[in-house]
């Protein structure tokens, strides 16, 4: 069989270890791994690593901007940097942009901000904040977030409308109950505000 693409002589990372070998690709999928494979197109990967794309589970992107963070990392440079480093998918945190990703409207704004800018796949975390306990968590679930994030310690800039907010004990408890109904994870930035604010 001759595949569309063969990556030859690369250091291939396998479940059992690493080996210098060839990888055949057909229709965007790996169809064979072994020696002396042939393909219509051949890439010589001698001296290079051939591995599955990596997933970065914690990335902050500031598109669509907001407040003093407009010059921080956006989708164009952030996703290009990921691709350059071998990261093919990342999970975006719900804060550092205005508005924070805490309901249907803010999630749609975030998705729109990324249109035609992505060089890699992106999944979204939705925020659990005191202001989205009346439907926002469910809206985020319906919008396709992969999980949720909250902060126990003080966060966000209270002078910027729509910025991320930390939870108190009650909103954490209520938020956890709602997230549990979605079957998704809740990542907790776990600090103790009275200690961290000193």
Name each region found by the language model.
Residues 53-59, 90-92, 122-126, 148-150, ...:
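Hydrophobic faces of well-ordered beta-strands that scaffold small-molecule active sites
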Residues 10, 28, 47, 58, ...:
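Divalent metal-coordination and catalytic microenvironments
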Residues 48-113, 117:
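Metal-associated gating/positioning segment near the N- to mid-region
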């Amino acid at each position: 069989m001759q595949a569309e693409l063969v990556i030859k002589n690369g250091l291939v990372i396998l479940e059992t270890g690493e080996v210098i070998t060839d990888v055949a690709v057909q229709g965007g999928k790996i169809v064979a791994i072994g020696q002396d494979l042939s393909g219509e197109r051949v890439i010589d990967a001698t001296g290079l690593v051939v591995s599955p794309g990596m997933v970065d589970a914690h990335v902050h992107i500031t598109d669509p901007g907001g407040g003093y963070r407009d010059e921080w990392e956006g989708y164009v440079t952030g996703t290009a940097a990921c691709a350059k480093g071998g990261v093919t998918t990342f999970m975006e945190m719900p804060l550092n942009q205005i508005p924070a990703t805490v309901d249907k409207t803010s999630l749609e704004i975030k998705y729109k901000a990324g249109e035609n800018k992505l060089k890699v796949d992106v999944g979204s975390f939705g925020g659990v904040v005191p202001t989205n306990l009346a439907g926002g968590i469910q809206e985020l679930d319906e919008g396709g977030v992969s999980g949720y994030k909250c902060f126990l310690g003080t966060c966000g800039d209270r002078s910027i409308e729509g910025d991320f907010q930390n939870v108190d004990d009650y909103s954490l408890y209520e938020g956890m109950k709602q997230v549990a109904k979605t079957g998704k994870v809740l990542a907790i930035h776990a600090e103790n505000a009275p200690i961290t604010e000193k």
